[in-house]
Amino acid sequence: MTMPYYASAEQIMRDRSELARKGIARGRSVVVLTFRDGVLFVAENPSTALHKVSELYDRLGFAAVGKYNEFENLRRAGIVHADMRGYSYDRRDVTGRSLANAYAQTLGTIFTEQPKPYEVEICVAEVGRVGSPKAPQLYRITYDGSIVDEQHFVVMGGTTEPIATAMRESYRADLDLEAAVGIAVNALRQGGAGEGEKRNVDVASLEVAVLDQSRPRRAFRRIAGTALEQLVPAEPAAASESAPEPKPDTETKPADTQD
């Protein structure tokens, strides 16, 4: 008689974590950061129809990486949750923390109870109302339901380590919009496959949006077209193109003298 297959709970959780992490790493990167006027979202996304960044509610934004169908289900569920809470109580009762907690519960339940975890990582961002001293909030929620209140910026998907390193080196709290877009795009260009290798990230492959704290009700707005082209820094010239060509040796040597 064959023995039944057995795997420890620890091994099952480890396998699920590995599956989710590999799925997330296959995606393109997203950078979310706070700047002087609110929160900026910059995502690598060549598609114009499928969005990785979107609005959740009046002062809330959403960014995600991983499997599109899975994080799209989460996005829509978050919108319904926010609408129901705002309708039942008050619009001010819909906060980033409440949405982040709801997402963490959902992802944690799926991770432990379903055969396959969601291969997603999401960020919920919130800005205060006009004139409020409340600082912007960033919440990172991972595939297993873990939730982290991040300071300053979040990097998700793809090769995150070189991008996060570039962000740590160049981030400042008082950035304006143009400077914030510049350091986010330059950080995404650091996510090459090899050490020191830079990737080509142009305007056509970017999805950019902001939560603008100065807007009176709905803070979310997208930036595209000419407005985005004016914000994105130009690609750095290759070293071979920028270096001056060596001049040919035109100096004449003195003629040999005979004794």
From Swiss-Prot:
Regulation: The formation of the proteasomal ATPase ARC-20S proteasome complex, likely via the docking of the C-termini of ARC into the intersubunit pockets in the alpha-rings, may trigger opening of the gate for substrate entry. Interconversion between the open-gate and close-gate conformations leads to a dynamic regulation of the 20S proteasome proteolysis activity.
Functional pathway: Protein degradation; proteasomal Pup-dependent pathway
Keywords: Cytoplasm, Proteasome
Keyword hit for Cytoplasm: yes
SUPFAM superfamilies reported for this sequence: N-terminal nucleophile aminohydrolases (Ntn hydrolases)
Bias (Low complexity) ranges: 233-243
Pfam families xref list: Proteasome
PTM: The N-terminus is blocked.
Region feature (Disordered): 231-259
Name of the protein in its database record: Proteasome subunit alpha 1
Naturally occurring in which organism (per UniProt): Rhodococcus erythropolis (Arthrobacter picolinophilus)
